Design a protein with these regions (language model features):
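Extracytosolic ligand-binding ectodomains
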Residues: 1-218
Length: 218
């Protein structure tokens, strides 16, 4: 039994809809379904309703600062159920904004956040280690997965143009759709004419906040 609390943005609504769609496939019952607005600064009313439900865990479908407010309010109303966030808050900024309340929160994220925790044989390790080092040296701030997405998008395009031997749109498109085994910061990309995302669930690691930092759930 799971409770949902979701924001009102496009990402939030999309995730909320997908959660409702897939929950029955995994035998999950959504027993509470609360929402909050983009300008809301207090979600204790929604969380108090969730506390009174029969939920065994809570999932926050949110992006931006909303999930940090949810996390702080979550502890304030005395909720002790497992709290899961989305990859939409996969950055150190979320931990900073949430403070000690973030301890124990879990969320799926790309390997870019935890290169030092990857096995040496992991194909992403050299890629994400170098990106994190170079990004933080250049910008003097913690790396986040969002910059990594932009980097991957650019490098996939460059790779496709090189393989196409041209900047002709149709040829570049065909080259992109034939991308196989591209190791990026967000995962190993395998595209096709029907799959322009190119990633599967192996692109995500389940992370947990411990002592104000990321740890891997094994």
């Amino acid at each position: 039994k799971v409770a949902l609390i979701s924001g009102s943005g496009g990402f939030d609504k999309s995730m909320h809809g997908e959660c409702l769609k897939v929950a029955p496939k995994y035998g999950i019952e959504v027993v509470a379904d609360e929402t909050y607005g983009a300008a809301d600064t207090d979600m204790t009313a929604q969380l108090t309703k969730i506390r009174a439900s029969s939920a065994q865990a809570v999932l926050n479908a949110g992006f931006g600062q909303g999930p940090a407010i949810v996390t702080r309010n979550y502890r304030q109303v005395g909720l002790t159920l497992p709290l899961y966030q989305s990859h939409g808050v996969a950055s150190k900024e979320y931990i900073k904004l949430s403070g000690p309340a973030a301890e124990g929160v879990r969320l799926p994220a790309a390997a870019l956040l935890v290169p030092e925790l990857l096995a040496d044989k992991d194909p992403q390790k050299p890629i994400v280690t170098a990106y994190k080092r170079d990004y933080e040296a250049r910008f003097k701030t913690d790396v986040s997965t969002f910059g990594g997405h932009a980097y991957d998008g650019l490098m996939l395009a460059v790779n496709a143009i090189k393989r196409a031997g041209s900047t002709d749109k149709a040829k570049v498109r065909d080259a992109l759709e034939s991308t196989r085994g591209y190791v990026g910061t967000g995962g190993v990309v395998n595209m096709s004419a029907s799959d322009h995302m190119g990633l599967d669930l192996s692109a995500f690691l389940m992370l947990e906040v411990k002592n104000g930092n990321w740890s891997m759930v094994r």
